[in-house]
Amino acid sequence: MQLTTTISVLLGSALALSMCGCGKDKTADAPKTDMQPKEMSPDHIVAMVNGTPLTWANMERRAMGYLKDDIEVNHLAVPTNRMEEAKEHFRRRSISAFVFKTVMMDEAANQKIALAEVDRLDGLRALEVTLKSRNWTTNDFFQKGPMGEAVMRQEFEDGLVIDKLLKRNVREKLKIGDEDIANLTAALEATNQTVFVKLEGIRKQLLDGADFADTARNVSEDESAKKGGDLGEFTRGKMLRDFEAPAFTQEVGAVGPIIRTRYGYHVLKVTARTPAVPATDSSPAVPETVRLSHILLKTVPIDHKRITDTIARQKYNEGVDVYFRDLKAKARIECLLYKDMTF
């Protein structure tokens, strides 16, 4: 089960709102003004979708929950003099999320989408995986969530309903053809070829006398760049298999040919070599060691599963966008608070 939609609805992520194309601000490119809505009574209706109202209180609770979540979890830093602007941003996001969710839930009701216990269990397992990056449990999610436990649990249920709706109407209709796979494979190969050509140019500079360590610090995409590309000392069998042959045959100080590993394209330089010492009656054998530096430019991994997964995600997002736009066109949507918001 994919929980992208669920989590997006719950947390009001920009992904969901941009994916569904809702809540566009006509004045996004216009000069900002000081015309912001003043606080209203809790029951004041700020938006309507198919007769379902969004009150100021519910909008504000969700918006301030989003703001709190971004500050505490995503470490959003909001200067004091920009706090009101931030609140307005999250109020608009709150309205957009309400529109997306309400349109989808209305259609789910029309199609009589219902949850089974297995849906909830699958959803909780998927949520648990999603939350690992936050070091949260599912209970943390519900109890520490930005809108209170009761609302978070209801939002989770609603998100599962929406996922089930989208599975029936979008995901199960996805088709990935040989041409899709061939096109993406060709695009990725072209990207990797560009990386190879770039490293060829860097290698030429090294052959012309550029300092290896300085170049590594400036261009290498590996952690070792901080140390001028130095990887340390190795014996045979203790390094990447693709490194071993050149590392133990390359002359000390020479700039080696470009080699490819699962990480990308590399240029190697052996900076020191210590010959092997045979065993004696009083001491064990000491194996040959090399000290190695490299420059890495990363490539895009190309494998069938990764490619098909990428195509599936792209087609799914496009499918959700089209599906939502069709539903939205039939819906009665009105934003009473921000007249510049269109749906």
What kind of feature is each model-predicted range?
Residues 77-86, 196-245, 260-261, 271-291, ...:
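Peptidyl-prolyl cis-trans isomerase
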Residues 1-9:
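Bacterial N-terminal signal peptides that target proteins for export
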Residues 53-57, 81-102, 114-121, 147-160, ...:
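Soluble non-cytosolic domains of exported or imported proteins
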Residues 18-21:
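C-terminal motif of bacterial Sec signal peptides marking the signal peptidase cleavage site
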Residues 23-24, 32-155, 311, 315-318, ...:
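N-terminal targeting/tethering segments
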Residues 41-50, 55, 109-111, 211, ...:
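Envelope-exposed proteins and targeting segments
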Residues 139-187, 211, 217-222, 242-299:
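Proteostasis/folding factors centered on peptidyl-prolyl cis-trans isomerases
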